């Protein structure tokens, strides 16, 4: 049986732009993508901390070191410049689950620069439920 787990997240990034008339996606600074192990065109889930909106889309790579976190397409209606968002990626793992499992969390500052990279750890799968 496969289970879906958090693979990585970019925590509390600031939206730097929105472009409604674009064919969907989210542009993210390539350095942040690399740190969070996110590939171009990978599916992501976004949560807007300011308004509670949650949606899924795919990633487009933005210039490395730019701090860009731009919502594009119809989702531009779900976030405004300056909003705080959390970006999630997930992974499907066949049981038995490797223990410990270590999702990666990329913490950023107000300019979307990496301030810290953490690894959430649990000694057994049941502990994952309480550490996320």
From Swiss-Prot:
Principal location: cytoplasm
Cofactor dependence: pyruvate
Cytoplasm recorded as keyword: yes
Binding site for substrate: 57, 73-75
The record's free-text note on cofactor binding: Binds 1 pyruvoyl group covalently per subunit.
Cell compartment(s), UniProt: Cytoplasm
InterPro entries noted in UniProt: Asp_de-COase-like_dom_sf, Asp_decarbox
Active site: 25 (schiff-base intermediate with substrate), 58 (proton donor)
The keyword Cytoplasm is annotated on this UniProt entry: yes
Protein family (similarity comment): Belongs to the PanD family.
Matching PANTHER family: ASPARTATE 1-DECARBOXYLASE (PTHR21012:SF0)
Subunit record text: Heterooctamer of four alpha and four beta subunits.
Name this polypeptide is given: Aspartate 1-decarboxylase
Originating organism: Rippkaea orientalis (strain PCC 8801 / RF-1) (Cyanothece sp. (strain PCC 8801))
Gene name of this polypeptide: panD
